[in-house]
Amino acid sequence: MLQQKKLFYGGDYNPEQWSKAIILEDMRLMKKANVNYVSLNIFGWASIQPTEEGFDFSFLDEMLDLLWENGIGIDLANGTASPPAWLVKKHPEILPVTSQGTPLVHGSRQHYCPSNKVYRSYVIRLTEEVAKRYATHPGIVMWHVNNEYTCHISECYCESCEKSFRQWLQMKYKKINTLNECWSTKFWSQSYSQWDEIFLPKEMPTFKNPAHQLDYKRFISDQNLTLFKAEKKAIRSYSKDIPVMTNLMGLHKHVDGFAFAEEMDVVGWDSYPNPFEEKPYPQFLANDLTRSLKKKPFLVMEQAPSAVNWRRANGAKSPGQMRLWSYEALAHGADGILFFQWRQSQGGAEKFHSGMVSHNQDTNSRIFKEVVQLGTEMSQLDELVGTNYNAEVAIVFDWENWWALELDAKPSGEINYIKQMRDLYTIFHELNIGVDFIHPKEDLSNYKLVLSIAQYLVTDDFSAKVKRYIKAGGHFLTTFFSGIVDEYDRVYLGGYPGAFKEVLGIYVEEFDPMPIGRKSQIKYGETYYTTELWKEVIHLQGAETIATFTEGYLMGQPALTKFGYGKGKTYYMGTKLAKDGNMKFIQTILAESKIQPLNQVEIESENSKISMTCRSNSSHDYIFLLNYGQTSEKVKLKKGGQSLLDGSMVEGEVSVKANDVKIIKLTK
C-alpha cells in the first residue's frame, strides 16, 4: 500500500488536449512548480478505446513514461467517468433517465446509469485492460477509479434501476409484509402484495412515502458504491498493492462518504470554496469530515488555482487566498494539494475554469507565481506526511439522517442539515478547538464532548450507545428535531425526542416552527440572544433550564436545557441561535467538559483572526497559525521552536502577517 514520503503537489493532467510541443513545455513548467504528482486519464475513455473493436494505448504509454522520466508520480485513472459516443449509440439503454422519463444523452459527462449491466460490462473490460497494461509501471503511485460519483447524476429512473431497486429491497426485507410494516404502507392504501408492484419514486400526485424515498436514496448510494467496488476488483486482479481511491466531494449529499471510505485505500475530496467568502466554513468543515472518514490524512484531489466556471458569478481568488486555503487543508490533515487542472483548457465546457497554467501561458502571471510559491514551500514540508490530527470533540455525521431529514412533509421545510452543522462547527473553528466527525456506529468514548446535530433519524443501537457514553461521564449536546424517528422514518412514540428523551431529562410536546425571516429572542442569563426557524414546547423531567423564550405563549418556558445523567451531562437546544448565542452556549459546555484550545500558543488579541491547529507525531507538534485578518497579529509561544517555512528558530512573541501562515515545529 501507499508509502508516501512527500506531500503530493500537482493536479489533473489532460495531455490529450495538447500538442507534443506543449506537453514537453509542461514537463519543464511542472519541475519549476515542484509538481510531483498528477492525475491522468480521468476522461480518457474515448482516447484509449476509440472504437469497440480495439484499444490504442500508444499515447498513454508515452505519457506515463514521460512523466516518470521527469520524476512525476501518477494517479492513473481507469477512465470510466464519461462513456464514449460509440458506446451510447450502440447501447442507449446505459443512459440515465430523469423522474419524468427523459433519457440524458451523450455530449456532457457522467451520462450513465450506475446499475446498468451493459455499462458495467464495458467498464470492467476497460478497467481490466488498463490495469493489465500498467500494473507494473514504476510511475504509478495510485489507481484512480471513475470521477466524482453522483456529481451530476444523483438519481436514475430507468428500467434497469427499477429492476435493481426491487432486488435490493427483496435482499433487505426478505418478505413483502416486512417491507409494508417498515414503510407504514397502511397509510393512504399503499400496501404491496408482490415485489413487482413497487416502482421507483418517480413523479407522483402529491407527497411520496418518505420511507420509500429514503430507501431509494440508500439504493442509489449503494449502486454507486457497488460500481466502485466492481471497478476496484478489476484493478486488483492485476495490481495487488498499489492503493485504489476515487475523489469524493466533501459535503456532497448523494453518496455515503463513510461507506465509500471503507472501500478506499486513501480518501480524497474536491474542494471548491467560494472566493467571495472570507472564511468558507463549509469547505473547512469538509476538510475535517474527509479526514474523519478514515481518521487518517487525506488528499485534496481538486481545487481551483483561481476562478471556477459553474457559479453565477465566478470570482477570482484574491492574491494569497489560494495559498491560505491550501494551508487550511494541510493544517487539518491533508497530505497533498492538487488542482483541477494543470493547464487551462482551450475549449469545452470548463475552458473558463482556471488552471495552474492559464490561457495567457505567462509564467510571470500571478496565478503561476502563486502555484510555484506553494509548490516550493510544500517541497520543504515533507516531515508533515502521516502526522496525526487529534480532537476531543466529535460531531456525528450521518448521510442517512441527512437524506431523511430533508425529505418532504416536515414541520419546517427550511431545516438544512449542513447549515445546522456549519453554525456550530464554526464556533469550534473560531475557538481553535479541534473536531472529528464520526459515524453513528463509531466508538464515542474517545471524546470528551459529542454533538448530535439535527439528528432526526436515530437507530436503537445509537440511542443505547449514547446512553452508555453519558453514563460513563461523557458530555452530549443535541439540537431541536433530533431523535424523532427510527431508520424506517417511523416516529418514536411517547413524546419527542423519543430516542434521546431519557438522557436529556425533557420531553417536547409540540413543535412551533417560525416562518422565513421572522426572528425571536431567548433570555440567557441577563442577556438576550436572537433566534430563528424553530421554537417548541419543552417540559422538564429533571433537566435544568439554561435559557428561556421571551415572547408569546412560550414566554418564560425552556429554550436551552442541561441535565445530569449518570456521570455525564447532556445539553439541548430547542431553537436555532444566532452566532453570539451559539458562542455563549458552546463556551459554557466546553468549560464544563474541561476542553481547552491548544496550550502551546497564547493568542494575545481578544478579537483575533488567527486560526490555530496542530498536527503531531511521536516526537513533535506542528502548530499551524493562519491569519485570516487584514492586519498582522502576534502570538506568544510557550516554548521555542522552528518556523518550517523559513527555517528560523523562534521563541516568545511571533508575528503572523495578514493573509499569511506560519508552521512552528515544537519538540515534545
Curated annotation (Swiss-Prot):
GO cellular component: beta-galactosidase complex
Record SUPFAM superfamilies: (Trans)glycosidases, Class I glutamine amidotransferase-like
GO biological process: galactose metabolic process
E.C. code: 3.2.1.23
UniProt: Zn(2+) binding residues: C113, C156, C158, C161
Catalytic activity: Hydrolysis of terminal non-reducing beta-D-galactose residues in beta-D-galactosides
Pfam families per the UniProt record, alphabetical: Glyco_hydro_42, Glyco_hydro_42C, Glyco_hydro_42M
Gene3D superfamilies: 3.40.50.880, Glycosidases (3.20.20.80), Golgi alpha-mannosidase II (2.60.40.1180)
Active-site residues, Swiss-Prot/TrEMBL: E148 (proton donor), E302 (nucleophile)
Positions contributing to substrate binding: R109, N147, W310, E350, K351, F352, H353
Catalytic temperature dependence: Optimum temperature is 30 degrees Celsius for activity with ONPG as substrate. Loses half of its activity at 30 degrees Celsius within 1 hour. Inactivated at 40 degrees Celsius in 10 minutes. In the absence of glycerol, the enzyme is extremely unstable even at low-temperature incubation, with an 85% loss of activity at 20 degrees Celsius after 1 hour.
GO MF, any single term: metal ion binding
Keywords: Glycosidase, Hydrolase, Metal-binding, Zinc
Protein family: Belongs to the glycosyl hydrolase 42 family.
Function: Capable of hydrolyzing the chromogen 5-bromo-4-chloro-3-indolyl-beta-D-galactopyranoside (X-Gal) at low temperatures. pNP-beta-galactoside, pNP-beta-fucoside and pNP-beta-galacturonide are also hydrolyzed, but not pNP-beta-galactosidase, pNP-alpha-galactoside, pNP-beta-mannoside, pNP-beta-arabanoside, pNP-beta-xyloside, pNP-beta-glucuronide nor pNP-betacellobioside at 20 degrees Celsius.
Protein name, entry field: Beta-galactosidase BgaB
Source species of the chain: Carnobacterium maltaromaticum (Carnobacterium piscicola)
Gene designation per UniProt: bgaB
